[in-house]
Amino acid sequence: MGRLRLPLVILVAVAAAGAATFLLRPRSGLIDPAPVDVEAYFTAFQLDRAEDYRSVQRLLGIGGLVVSTGTLALLAWRPPRGLFERLGRRPLLGAAAAGAGISVLLVMVGLPIDAWQRSRALDVGLATQSWPDWALDVVKSTAVGAGVAAVGGLLALVLVRRFRRNWWAPAAVVIVAFGVITIWLWPVVIDPIFNDFEKLPPGPVRQDVLGLADEAGVDVGEVYRVDASRRTTAANAYVGGLGHSKRVVLYDNLIAGFPRDEVRLVVAHELGHQKHNDLSRGLLWLALVAPAGTFFAQRLAEAFGRRYGLGDPAVKPGPIVLPAVALAVTLASLLLGSASNVLSRQVEARADAFALDLTQDPAAFVQFERRIALRNVIDPEPPWLTRFLFATHPTTMERIGIGEAWEKPE
């Protein structure tokens, strides 16, 4: 693996992510947002409230990322040798235990920040769930995460031991397969652990969904209502699943709290994702980037775990190398994720344009974007750096600009 220096490997991975984003970008159906004045849509009080809330939440989120990454770095640098020696007596079972244990540890070290963020969400009225119910959700999500991490730890050690110098190649295949399985099974296996889903009953909303789907020529799969209101006052909708698990999911507080014409626009936006196969587009991006990304992760992992035999063809590594692998995968994902977010913002903007074309209702579109920003306490114009690094959707003002541009084309 010494053939390529690490800086060159990083450059190749970043180039692969950028090339995949460029290749898969929407080539039509986008609308350049019209210039709009934020003060024409939001009062000074509303802007200050959103900034006060979101600025601290962003800092807490970044702090949580630093804490979790720092914890992995500490584990990779100074792993508890006695514990890992015991796990190494039965390497594969030990790897599963190590994966689960690392996952639980990361939840625990991040819990104070998560609780702080939730406390602030309660203060602004976004969170509705009691603390005991929230704690139960933490236990559930920790258990699910530990199970997934156990499988991940087991597979990682199998690949590292079997393909000592080139485990990045089969790892790329595993990551893509995991992405497909996750999108396919998560809506029917994991989501029901946390929420109750019911098929949207006959009525105006279901009629609108099916009518819009027919007009758009989209196989909508099934339409579900989820009891999101038991956790939050925020409203949302999303598409998920593949094949028989394909679905459109509407928050119950979206259906109950917004006018019918605005709900139609949200539905039309989600149909735009299905019309353009955006979930499959995301999987294709992953497939294109995974080889370079896992090669980058392997080089990082070998740098972190060399003293424990990682990268040495004469050594069969044990579970003690897993913190180094986890840290490397985390850093690679953070570096390459911004390119994925660029693509996500583009397909979201195209889905907005699709919704406007389908409903022909720009006034309702603009009103919805304003209303959802107020309800979800969204900063209409967040700082450009956090937007570039983390945002998966256009900003509120960009989306309002799309609506205004559609209504008044040049």
Language model regions located:
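Polar-ligand-bearing catalytic/cofactor-coordination segments
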Residues: R3-V9, T21-K316, T330-E410
